[in-house]
Curated annotation (Swiss-Prot):
Biological process per Gene Ontology, one example term: nucleobase-containing compound metabolic process
Co-factor binding details: Binds 1 [4Fe-4S] cluster.
Subcellular location: Nucleus
Keyword Cell membrane listed: no
One Gene Ontology CC term in the entry: nucleus
Gene behind this protein: DDX12P
Family to which the UniProt record says this protein belongs: Belongs to the DEAD box helicase family. DEAH subfamily. DDX11/CHL1 sub-subfamily.
Cofactor: [4Fe-4S] cluster
Main location: nucleus
This protein's name: Putative ATP-dependent DNA helicase DDX12
Residue ranges occupied by any Helicase ATP-binding domain in the UniProt entry: 28-464
Organism name: Homo sapiens
Region annotated Disordered, chain positions: 191-213, 220-239, 308-331
Keyword DNA-binding: yes
Length: 950
């Protein structure tokens, strides 16, 4: 459909009845969707989504949590896909019936619906060409198009027939299983009868086989035709599966969010018909218990690949002697990596919607790998559900078999899309890792050097040279123990990529070729296997030379009791040890191939070489997002809180070359009644102290006292849970100590039991559990303590992914504006990059300055959005800083909050506004009964997955 075109299909808006989607009209809001209960706001959401997909736009959609965003995405996107496929079939039927294709001067772009039409009809002809030549070329193009459509239609018909057979096969599966069991019982009875006859008094016993001779006995023969009949696989199946139909890739951040989305698909009107497949990591989908027990993601990945390659390499010579087939089945040591069984798993996964847990159970039952089986289902799937880290990383995307050409991508929970893309492609390596990798590689060459070919030796020596120069640029010596090396110069140095290559004296090495060699040879995996097998042999050598090697081997062993007893630092607890230092360094080498203007290298020289680091900082995340936008038909970026949208427009879309006209914004209001939320901006405190928590003023005693007094007053009128966010952990500790010293903490404790967010990720769930239990107890006991106060940190463990719905968060307080550290070298470099790259809009701040404000407001929006989580929820939001009253700042709040904000110049009217609504807003209104403890724990699951993925 072209933007501004006419209507296609009947259009109508009805009441809360069951609808049938039948078309779209861009100049009308009349759309009917297949969903039983559909609020008007959700109709607008789905109608706009449909238009974005039809017109091939880039959409930024905001729909607050609890407003039915997932269901709207499902119904809007799948309705478009269904209509798209229907129009494609109708157009193909018309072309096949008439035997002619569309000419180049036809205006309706929707006639050429398939990628197979590209380059067929409509080829511009040179000026002055004879008419008969033009007519001949057009006729030939039309015939070619019709022939292609016939072939495509035949393939689609075969695929649909096979999928119908698959659905029928799933229904007959258990009946066939019972027949197999009966057959096995019959065979067992026959075998027992033969044994009884053979063991008779006059029976002649066969000669006892010697050890090893069992392998010489012929196994039961089964022909290829019998296997084919048993599995239902025909010769053309591979060809059918290779064709990627038009599909929707739906991405989200965590596996739990994806599972929830799949559950919503099952409940939707499309649940019985859509072909859906869920993709995940090996850690989530592996069914081999020996591999799963390794725990670490990298260890699981290494072992999986090694098990696939080991037997294949051993039997490579024997396979070459066999008659070559069109596609040979790989030999694999893993019993679940069986192509025939994985094909069956693929078929059953497409027959009906399954989430990841069901896919895992199916893999165990069928003894097939769900990780690879799910990838086999991608071509025929209509809806592919996957973590968006898998989509944004080009190598992972290619390895998974994901093809984005002319497809639709929907990225849900996309508020952290820029940060995730940046962190995925930013790499930091330590001096200790560089020395460990160098020592391992030297030992590997000593062991196998005589068996290696010249080209292998050449690349290994280049890698050794690179490692040596990386250590040298930090000021260390590769031959000495990194833990005992003290650096003469300390501090941080930031360089462009080219300057770093020149300073390191590695500008003469082709890093692209080295990166390719590492990928193809899998040297890091082989090196890790080498350290596992022979680490003990080399541990007897002198300590200084092999310190890095031994330290790596020791890191693989369980920690000692003393180490476990020591308090773990937050960064150490959240970052797992890599399986191989070289594997991590390969990521750094790949990052150095980025364009010079898109990244920087930060040299951080600490006291010792082992603590010093080299970090690649990606400045332009759009360079990795541009390929997605370029290939896809349409891209939708959706989330509960997408403000400030200018962040996405500038850093992600404008830098990716997306024209402003192609970007469509849509913000959906909240479904809660207007009086269910009370957002306040308080400009001065109880003692009329102006509230402006700048870096220079926030440490003043009177400012910290004002926060305490305001909280005391709020806790006196708000029943239930109060969550107060501070800009940083350090400031929270400082304020807490000041309150304790001045007595304000005791006054607060008399009204609310006080909880404090832990810095360790492992203690978050415990604190949340105690907090929710305290609120439940206070609700049952009418005493002086009316609830609990949770002191949290913006950007911490509880500002994202934890839902403070209902009584868990009746009031959310934001202390100050949580601006990022402006003195950070990384932030300053990003600001400078944006100032140089993006133009300054008239009347707007410089792009670099706007970035700082956007980062602040994004953190604020994520924190205050924790309170309202469903339609019948209610809470107050208090922003303690007069800077929130500025129009440019208010404009970056979510629309549903911004429309209801009340700015109070003094504290008196503010607390009066809270007191005015208190009798009905907090005490008398009955909220929906919910299990706060289980809800808190489910919310904490998001944080566990987030920590694991990081």
């Amino acid at each position: 459909m072209r933007s501004g075109g006419g209507c296609s299909g009947s259009l109508s808006l009805r009441g809360p009845a069951s609808f049938k989607f039948s078309g779209v009209c861009p100049d009308s809001r009349g759309l009917a969707f297949s969903v039983a209960i559909l609020p008007a706001k959700k109709e607008d959401f789905m109608a706009e989504l449909y238009r974005v997909l039809e017109a091939g736009k880039i959409g930024i959609f905001e729909s607050p949590t609890g407003t039915g965003k997932s269901l709207s995405l499902i119904c809007g996107a799948l309705s478009w896909l269904r209509d798209f496929e229907q129009k494609k079939r109708e157009e193909e039927a018309r072309l096949l019936e008439t035997g002619t294709g569309p000419l180049h001067d036809e205006k309706d772009e929707s006639l050429c619906l398939s990628s197979s039409c590209e380059g067929a009809a409509g080829t511009p002809r040179p000026a002055g060409e004879p008419a008969w030549v033009t007519q001949f070329v057009q006729k030939k193009e039309e015939r070619d198009l019709v022939n292609r459509l016939k072939a495509e239609q035949a393939r689609r018909k075969q695929r649909e027939e096979r999928l119908q057979q698959l659905q029928h096969r799933v229904q007959l599966k258990y009946a066939a299983k019972r027949l197999r069991q009966e057959e096995e019982e019959r065979e067992n009875l026959l075998r027992l009868s033969r044994e009884m006859l053979e063991t008779g008094p006059e029976a002649e016993r066969p000669e006892q086989l010697e050890s090893g001779e069992e392998e010489l006995v012929l196994a039961e023969y089964e022909s290829d035709e019998e296997k084919k009949v048993a599995s239902g696989v025909d010769e053309d199946e591979d060809d059918l599966e290779e064709e990627h139909i038009t599909k929707i890739y739906h991405c989200s951040r965590t596996h739990s969010q994806l599972a929830q989305f799949v559950h919503e698909v099952k409940k939707s009107p499309f649940g019985k018909d859509v072909r859906l497949v869920s993709l995940g990591s090996r850690q989530n989908l592996c069914v081999n218990e020996d591999v799963r027990s390794l725990g670490s993601v990298q260890l699981i990945n290494n072992r999986c690949v090694d098990m696939q390659r080991s037997r294949h390499e051993k039997k490579k010579g024997a396979e070459e002697e066999k008659p070559k087939r069109r596609r040979q089945e790989k030999q694999a040591a893993c019993p679940f990596y069986n192509h025939e069984q994985m094909g069956l798993l693929r078929d059953e996964a497409l027959a009906e919607v399954k989430d990841m847990e069901q896919l895992l159970a199916l893999g165990k039952e069928a003894r097939a790998c769900p990780y690879y089986g799910s990838r086999l289902a991608i071509p025929a799937a209509q809806l592919v559900v996957l973590p968006y880290q898998m989509l944004l990383h080009a190598a992972t995307r290619q390895a998974a078999g994901i093809r984005l050409q002319d497809q639709v991508v929907i990225i849900d929970e996309a508020h952290n899309l820029i940060d995730t893309t940046t962190s995925m492609h930013s790499v930091e390596v330590s001096g200790s890792q560089l020395c460990q990798a160098h020592s391992q590689l030297l030992q590997y060459m000593e062991r196998y050097g005589k068996r290696l070919k010249a080209k292998n030796l050449m690349y290994l020596k280049q890698i050794l040279y690179l490692l040596e120069k990386f250590v040298a640029v930090l000021g260390g010596n590769i031959k000495q123990n990194p833990n005992t090396q003290s650096l003469s110069q300390t501090g941080m140095e930031l360089k462009t990529i080219n300057d770093f290559l020149f300073q390191s004296q590695i500008d003469n090495i082709n890093l692209f070729k080295v990166q390719r060699y590492c990928e193809k040879s899998m040297i890091s995996r082989k090196l890790f296997g080498f350290t596992e097998r022979y680490g003990a042999v080399f541990s007897s050598r002198e300590q200084p030379k092999l310190a890095g090697f031994q330290q790596f081997l020791q890191s693989l062993q369980p920690r000692t009791t003393e180490a476990l007893a020591a308090p773990a630092d937050e960064s150490q607890a959240s970052v797992p040890q890599p399986a191989s230092p070289l594997m991590h360094i390969e990521g750094f080498l790949a990052a150095l191939t980025t364009a010079n203007q898109d990244g920087r290298v930060i040299l951080s020289r600490q006291g010792s070489l082992s603590q010093s680091t080299l970090k690649f900082l990606l400045l332009n995340p759009a360079v990795h997002f541009a390929q997605v936008v370029k290939e896809c038909r349409a891209v939708v970026i959706a989330g509960g809180t997408m403000q400030p949208v200018s962040n996405f427009r500038q850093q992600l879309l404008a830098c990716a070359g997306v024209e402003a006209e192609r970007v469509v914004e849509f913000s959906c209001g909240h479904v809660i009644p207007p009086d269910n939320i009370l957002p306040l901006v308080i400009c001065s405190g109880v003692s009329n102290q102006p509230l402006e928590f700048t870096f220079q003023k926030r440490d003043l005693p009177q400012m910290m006292d004002e926060v305490g007094r305001i909280l005391c007053n709020l806790c006196g009128v708000v029943s239930g849970g109060v969550v107060c966010f501070f800009p940083s952990y350090e400031y929270l500790r400082q304020v807490h100590a000041h309150w304790e010293k001045g007595g304000l903490l005791g006054r607060l404790a008399a009204r609310k039991k006080i909880f404090q967010e832990p810095k360790s990720a492992h203690q978050v769930e415990q604190v949340l559990l105690a907090y929710s239990r305290c609120l439940q107890a206070c609700g049952q006991e009418r005493g002086p303590v009316t609830g609990a106060l949770l002191l949290s940190v913006v950007g911490g463990k509880m500002s994202e992914g934890i839902n403070f719905s209902d009584n868990l968060g009746r009031c959310v307080v934001m202390v100050g504006m949580p601006f990022p550290n402006i003195r950070s070298a990384e932030l300053q470099e990003k600001m400078a990059y944006l100032d140089q790259t993006l133009p300054r809009a008239p009347g707007q701040a410089h792009p670099g300055k706007a970035l700082v404000e956007n980062l602040c407001m994004k953190a604020v929006n994520q924190s205050i959005g924790r309170a309202i989580r469903h339609q019948k929820d209610f809470a107050s939001i208090v922003l303690l800083d007069q800077r929130y009253a500025r129009p440019p700042v208010l404009a970056k709040l979510p629309a549903w909050i911004r429309a209801r904000v009340e700015v109070k110049a003094t504290f008196g009217p503010a607390i009066a506004a809270v007191q005015k609504v208190s009798p009905t807003f907090f005490f008398l209104r009955a909220s929906q009964p919910r299990d706060h403890i289980s809800h808190c724990l489910l919310s904490a699951q998001f944080h566990r997955e987030k920590s694991a993925s990081s």
